[in-house]
């Protein structure tokens, strides 16, 4: 499933094309994806102008000029493809056009095609004033890319928790958008074991420890590095221009079971365990 860097990469690719343009046509080719499309989906979008394209957690948010927000989630295999006027572009390899489920025609002549072989993605229309309180968003945690994510916040969120640190970091009600790949990578860079209790990031009086400060900085750094690399293309992820991400070539631990730990002087071996149903990759020697 695309994680925050992949969704943010898609947002940055779509924004220059979508923002300021209007939907002249919307071709909805099936009744549902993961969930049914909203009633009169195409009719409610046609003629509307996109005023901004944002992101909340792993959701893309297109602000429309009628105070509605088009909420889009990529699911497991969703992707957007941009076809500019005059292009003879075809679906990327492995992306059969039969899986092109929504085609947005823009006032600029550009088409944006949503492709989703597994159909776990979905789209909703929500009134802007209702967005924060909507069930999709009302329990979503803080954004990890902003200044809000700092050691003091991690200490406050995790104080007293005996939950394993990696499991706590994946709790979307605490921190939004973090996924398995980038949590594994951040914990290795921070030298912290995924099995240590999350509460150890706070001192006895709830104050942030050095670990909390270090981890918050590294989480932001890993996410920003991944975004600059276009995300990680393991199965389905492509950028809006069809290019692959390449952060997967920088993985230190994720999917590298039995390989030597890349930390200089460590000499350990990357291990794989299962936590809360998810594979965790780490080095038991240098991650404490």
Curated annotation (Swiss-Prot):
Cofactor binding, note field: Binds 1 zinc ion per subunit.
Residues at the active site: 2-3, 58, 278
UniProt keyword annotation of Cell cycle present: no
InterPro entries noted in UniProt: DNA_glyclase/AP_lyase_DNA-bd, DNA_glyclase_Znf_dom_DNA_BS, Formamido-pyr_DNA_Glyclase, FPG_cat, MutM-like_N-ter, Ribosomal_uS13-like_H2TH, Znf_DNA_glyclase/AP_lyase, Znf_FPG/IleRS
Entry keywords, A to Z: DNA damage, DNA repair, DNA-binding, Glycosidase, Hydrolase, Lyase, Metal-binding, Multifunctional enzyme, Zinc, Zinc-finger
Zn finger region (FPG-type): 252-288
Needed co-factor(s): Zn(2+)
Catalytic activity: Hydrolysis of DNA containing ring-opened 7-methylguanine residues, releasing 2,6-diamino-4-hydroxy-5-(N-methyl)formamidopyrimidine; 2'-deoxyribonucleotide-(2'-deoxyribose 5'-phosphate)-2'-deoxyribonucleotide-DNA = a 3'-end 2'-deoxyribonucleotide-(2,3-dehydro-2,3-deoxyribose 5'-phosphate)-DNA + a 5'-end 5'-phospho-2'-deoxyribonucleoside-DNA + H(+)
E.C. designation(s): 3.2.2.23, 4.2.99.18
Superkingdom of this protein's organism: Bacteria
Binding sites annotated in the UniProt record for DNA: 99, 118, 161
GO molecular function: 8-oxo-7,8-dihydroguanine DNA N-glycosylase activity; class I DNA-(apurinic or apyrimidinic site) endonuclease activity; damaged DNA binding; zinc ion binding
GO BP of this protein: base-excision repair
Function as written in the Swiss-Prot or TrEMBL entry: Involved in base excision repair of DNA damaged by oxidation or by mutagenic agents. Acts as a DNA glycosylase that recognizes and removes damaged bases. Has a preference for oxidized purines, such as 7,8-dihydro-8-oxoguanine (8-oxoG). Has AP (apurinic/apyrimidinic) lyase activity and introduces nicks in the DNA strand. Cleaves the DNA backbone by beta-delta elimination to generate a single-strand break at the site of the removed base with both 3'- and 5'-phosphates.
Assembly behavior: Monomer.
Family of this protein: Belongs to the FPG family.
Protein name, as recorded: Formamidopyrimidine-DNA glycosylase
Source species of the chain: Beijerinckia indica subsp. indica (strain ATCC 9039 / DSM 1715 / NCIMB 8712)
